[in-house]
Amino acid sequence: MDKLSIRDLSLEGKKVLVRVDFNVPIKDGKILDDVRIHSAMPTIHYLLKQDAAVILVSHVGRPKGGVFEEAYSLAPIVPVLEGYLGHHVPLSPDCIGEVARQAVAQLSPGRVLLLENVRFHKGEEHSDEDPSFAIELAAYADFYVNDAFGTSHRKHASVYRVPQLFPDRAAAGFLMEKELEFLGQHLLVEPKRPFTAILGGAKMSSKIGVIEALLSCVDHLVLAGGMGYTFLRAMNRQVGNSLVEESGIPLAKKVLEKAQALGVKIHLPVDAKVAKQCDSGEDWRELSIQEGIPEGLAGFDIGAQTIELFSKVIQESATIFWNGPVGVYEVPPFDQGSKAIAQCLASHSSAVTVVGGGDAAAVVALAGCASQISHVSTGGGASLEFLEKGSLPGTEILSPAQS
């Protein structure tokens, strides 16, 4: 990695501002999934072992900005952090201002302080309009560490502006290093071959950039989920009432043509679980794509033959990247295809398997096989943008590695 690492910093007795991604699902004050908190712990534990004073900054959700909203408070994160650390973690009721400055001043080496949601201030998301927000955050610390890969595709103050105020002192945390290693080295730079990318999800248009980027480096491209029906329509297949982006059909045709020119093998569903609607998961059946899906029915998951086809492609690959479910995984039995993909990846222990965050990561967790995947990214949109562009605003801006 060509960026400064926390291993390169002289941390004893120093204050370190750490941008973490604690944007976890919270319901009724309880955290539903703490994977992102757990993923940041190696960096936090390391800093504490080095006798640094650790100041954590994060966001949760999408508050309006400019006002405190209890629904988006980081308060529910405190007991989870305390459970991992084994000691009290104070929460500053604001991330800037006198109350935050006092909390930082009182923070001792070897302890952790959590600042309240940075998105309660407009200066976080609109740093060009209010540069003072970044300046105030930066004033707290001697060093800056970015361990928030999942947010690093955004040019927000705590990710992009603040590190610019730490010349030669803005480093990557361990989670960030791991993300860059797997998405960069193992996928973009030196993938073991054959290299297969599996892309699902609803909309093709939101992933066209990463599709075109992947065409230049993969051997196989598996396309399914809602976007798969747009490609099938582009091939003049009858898909009934399945989700199709009409405006995306010309783009899909261009992708198919480019793949053929580059020698990339495209794999699309050959059958589907169909129903009139997916709400209840009832009255479904499997139909062949060759025969076509009639009007009045829509595909909500891949069928048994497609599972077998995709599994064979996976088993014959040495590197696999997966982003986006291949069906409506929230509604059984339309979860079977996505779970089968997850289990197939998990069983292929000799391959490098990378799951690109978001819904695919949720499926892997539901299937109970996350620990058997080489790397489950903490960034959905961030992982796709990194694969498309090769870097992110929040990673580009970090200090260069020491020579």
UniProtKB/Swiss-Prot annotation:
GO terms for cellular component: cytosol. The keyword Nucleotide-binding applies. It comes from the Bacteria. It is found in: Cytoplasm. Coiled coil: none annotated. Pathway: Carbohydrate degradation; glycolysis; pyruvate from D-glyceraldehyde 3-phosphate: step 2/5. Belongs to the phosphoglycerate kinase family. This is Phosphoglycerate kinase. The gene is pgk.
